Every structure is written in C-alpha cells, then in structure tokens.
Amino acid sequence: MHQQLKKMSLIGLILMIFTSVFGFANSPSAFYLMGYSAMPFYLFSALFFFIPFALMMAEMGSAYRREEGGIYSWMNHSVGPRFAFIGTFMWFASYVVWMVSTAAKIWVPLSTFLFGTDKTQTWALGSLTPTQTVGILAACWMVVVTFIAVKGINKIAKITAVGGIAVMGLNLVLLLVSGAILLLNGGHFAQPLNFTLSPNPGYQSGMAMLSFVVFAIFAYGGIEAVGGLVDKTDKPEKNFAKGIIIAAIVISIGYSLAIVLWGVSANWQQVLGARSTNLGNITYVLMTSLGATLGQALHLTPAASALTGVWFARITGLSMFLAYTGAFFTLSYSPLKAIIQGTPKALWPSVMTRLNVNGMPAAAMWLQCLLVGVFIVLVSFGGDSASAFYNKLTLMANVSMTLPYLFLTIAFPFFKAKTHLDRPFVIFKNRPSTLLATGVVLLVVTFANIFTIIQPVIDSGDWNSTLWMVGGPIFFSLLALGIYESYRRRMASGALVMEKIGRAHV
C-alpha cells in the first residue's frame, strides 16, 4: 500500500480528486433549492472560483512537490508560519463542522437502504426526540470511525476505495437511466426547462439566489485536500497539475449535466413540494422518482413502478452510506494529519504528536472524536425540528468550508513573488493575471459568505441562524490565534533562557 501511494499514477490522482470533490448529493440539493436555475450558478462558480482556484493549487503543489505538509507548507513558505497555522487550523475546523453535519446525515441513507424510505424523523430512543436520537447515533458513529481509523492508513484506504466505487456507480446510473427515460418519453422533461427562475418559493428572491452561490462553491470544495498527495504522485512536476486540470473540467461539466438530468424524471411541484422533503433526504426522494419514472416509461404497472422506485432508493441508500463512510474515514484523518504532523511539533503537547504502532496520531484522533461528539450533542439537543437541524448543519458546513479558501487565495500572490522556486507548471505568467485571478476568487468567496450569513435576517429576522453561521468560524479563528501565540511566547522564552545560559558560561 505504501508503494502504491508513493507513486500514484495520473489516472489514480484524477480519481482521487474526483472522489474528494464530486459529491453525488450536491446536484440533488441544487435541484431542490433552485431547479434548473442552479446550473448557471454552478457554471459561474466553476469559472470564477473552482477553475482559477484549482489552477492556483496546481501551481503551488507542483512547485512544493517535495513538501509533506500540504497546504500548511504552501502557506508557510509563501506568507509565514502564523498565517499558515491560522489558515490550516480553519481548514481543519471546517472539516470538524463537516463531520458534525455528516455524522447526523449518514443515518438517512442507512435508513433508506433498510426500510426503503427515510425513517429517521420517526426514530426515538426512550423519551428522546428523533433529532436527539440521531444525535446520539451520530456521536456513537464517530467513536466507531475513530476506533477503526487509529488502526492504520491501510484500513482507511480500503474503506475509502469502496466508497469511491459506490459514488461513481451512482453517477453512471443517473446518466444511463435518465438517458433511457428521455428516449422512451420522446425527449419530454418532467420539469419544464427554465434556467432563470427557481421553482422553490424560498429561493426566488434576489438575496436568496445570491446566497445560493455558497452552495455551488461548497460543491467544488475539497481539491486542496489532495495537496498532501503531491509528493506521492508519479512525475508530480507534470502529472499533479495535469490531474487537477482534467478533474476540474470533468467535475465542472458533470455537476451542470447532473442538475439538468434530475429534471428528466422529477417535476419539482409534484415530487419535491412535500414538507417532509429536506436537504438531508432529497437525494433519496429524487432517486425514488427516477426509478418510478423509469418503470412508467417502460409501461410497468403502477405497483411495479413504485417498487422500482423503492429499490432505486435502497440501492442509493447503500451506495451513499458507503460513500459517506469512505469520505468520513479519509477526512477524520487527513486534515488532522496536516494540523498535527505538518505544523511545528512544539505547537502541541507531546502526546498529541506521538504516533502509535500503526503510524497514526491516536491521541489527537481521539481528542478530535471527543470534540466532534460534544458539538453533535450540543446541536442535536438544541430543540430544532429534524428538518431545521439538517438544514442548519448544512449551512454551517458551507460557510466554514469556504473560509480556508480565502487564506490559500491570499497566499497565492506571495507565492508568485518568490523568485527562488523551481516552477514546472505555470499558468499565470505575469503579475496582472495573478492579481486578477486572486481578486476574482476572493470576491466570489467573500460575497457568497456575506449573502448567506445575512439572508436569514433580511428574509425573516432570523438572527439565531446568522449567529450560528458566524459563531463557529470566529471561535476557531480565535482558538488558532491563542494556540499560536502561546507557542510563540514559549519559543521566545526558551530562546531567552538559552541566551542567559550562554552568557553565564562566558
């Protein structure tokens, strides 16, 4: 396994990027919120965020191809250690929020696989509400994941491979079945084509549509995570940049195509208008509709068509459960590795950086498990309904995920100003193109977050949601500053002591 990772092929790198970035559940969420009108937003985010940002990562990764610290090393060499630590810590924190959200969401596909539909909103342990029950299960899930992950990277890689194959299979099913339905129905779309107006009443205001940009950006998140693989890629000076570019183009086209394909089988008002539909179960609602519509197009009986839809949902539930599991195992280790093993060891207590017999920072992983578990319990016992619970967690993850991109983008002009680097791949060949790309990406990410944060207040005076979205990132930023300043003072104090000892000997 070590040798395979050490020399990853171009195809292997592309597949790794694809499975890290392309989430099958993102296009159903987009169709639910915006219908076909989500596609222009996804294209906009691809052109003005994802593709230029991916090219920046390709340049930095190729230049720092021998570094093992991933994005921490890139920002450290480009700007400085304090900036790099705060940015990397925020990146790590965004994945903590992602784990809080996903540990709750993962029970929806499992329920769908077992029962043919989402039953999580009816689950109850004793006197606990469904939301509290899912929260307890999510905390237990985090313990199980950590217990297995600390046993070594081989265990993580095997589980991740299964998840990657599962999600790629789902994308193939959507493409082939939608194509078959379109042919059988004479080119008729269940949802009339309209790329300018959302069928969702809650996403027809200008403010709501602008806030949707953050969902599109979130869909393209994760490409920076492959930064730690650059030194394990075969001929990284050529293949790393090439892999990122190919994957970025395929992903950009793939999302837009998927959004259109959902309209082949699902009419928004008929399929998605129910109160029980939310961002947590939308994928399974749409896949049920896909299977049922295929049955109808094949002129099966209503009962047979409905049964086809149920089995599509069950297969999707199993595939999504495996995909979430694979992603969960990878992201419970990879960001933590960067923040613990990529940064100076003196930043952390020695027990945090100590590796177990399997080469894993076990103590740090268990502490992360505790942190995620506490957040899960706090949010799930907050009194929200299950639907609001899922939607709030999704918004928290969207905002937190996009903030680290600001740090990486700000670091890029400083990286370009370095004159001593061997740069095997250069796409931004002069200062104006560098500043233009940096400025565009910064504007897109900044305004997307601002619109998302203020939208609940403008639409309904909902300060609670706004405070939840703002509070998490601020807390982690202040925590990062506190940790780094404590480290800096300890280093300065140690240097002063050594200087006094040296003078005493003189």
What spans do the regions from the language model cover?
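Hydrophobic transmembrane alpha-helices that form the core helical bundles
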Residues: 55-57, 67-138, 328-335
